[in-house]
C-alpha cells in the first residue's frame, strides 16, 4: 500500500539536472512542493540522495533543491521527495506552482 501525497502535484514539462551518487539530466513531468517525477535515462536506486536543479520556464536561475530522496524507480523515470530546500528557493517554487493551472493525476 502506498502513502498518499501530502501536497498537490502539477502537470509540468521542463528540464532538470540532478547530482549525488548518480548525476544526470532529465525532464520533470509533475511537480509539487514536496517532490517531483523525473524521466531520465540515468539509472538511480530507491533511497539515493540527490541534489536537484529545476530549470523552470522563464526563470534565468534554476530552483535548487539541496536534498531529495528517490522514492520509486521505473524503467526511465523516478520520483523524488524533497527533503531540504532553502527558504528563498521554497518561495520561488511556491510562486511557480501558484501560476500552474493543471493538476497531475
Question: What do these predicted regions represent?
Answer:
Residues 20, 30, 70-72, 84:
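A residue-level detector for short acidic-glycine micro-motifs
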Residues 20-23, 59-66:
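Short coil-to-beta-strand transition motifs
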Residues 77-105:
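C-terminal output/interaction extensions
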Residues 38-40, 50, 62, 89-96:
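A short, polar/proline- and glycine-enriched secondary-structure boundary/capping micro-motif
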Residues 1-31, 94, 98-105:
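N-terminal helix initiation/capping motif
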Residues 12-46, 51-53, 77-79:
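Short strand-loop-strand
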Residues 27, 67-69, 81:
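Residues located in well-ordered beta-strands
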Residues 64-75:
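Short, compositionally biased
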Amino acid at each position: 500500500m502506498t502513502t498518499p501525497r501530502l501536497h498537490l502535484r502539477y502537470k509540468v514539462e521542463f528540464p532538470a539536472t540532478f547530482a549525488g551518487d548518480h548525476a544526470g539530466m532529465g525532464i520533470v513531468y509533475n511537480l509539487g512542493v514536496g517532490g517531483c517525477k523525473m524521466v531520465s535515462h540515468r539509472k538511480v536506486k530507491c533511497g539515493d540522495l540527490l541534489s536537484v536543479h529545476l530549470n523552470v520556464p522563464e526563470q534565468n536561475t534554476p530552483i535548487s533543491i539541496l536534498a531529495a530522496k528517490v522514492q520509486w524507480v521505473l524503467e526511465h523515470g523516478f520520483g523524488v521527495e524533497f527533503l531540504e530546500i532553502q527558504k528563498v528557493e521554497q518561495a520561488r517554487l511556491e510562486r511557480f506552482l501558484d501560476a500552474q493551472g493543471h493538476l497531475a493525476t
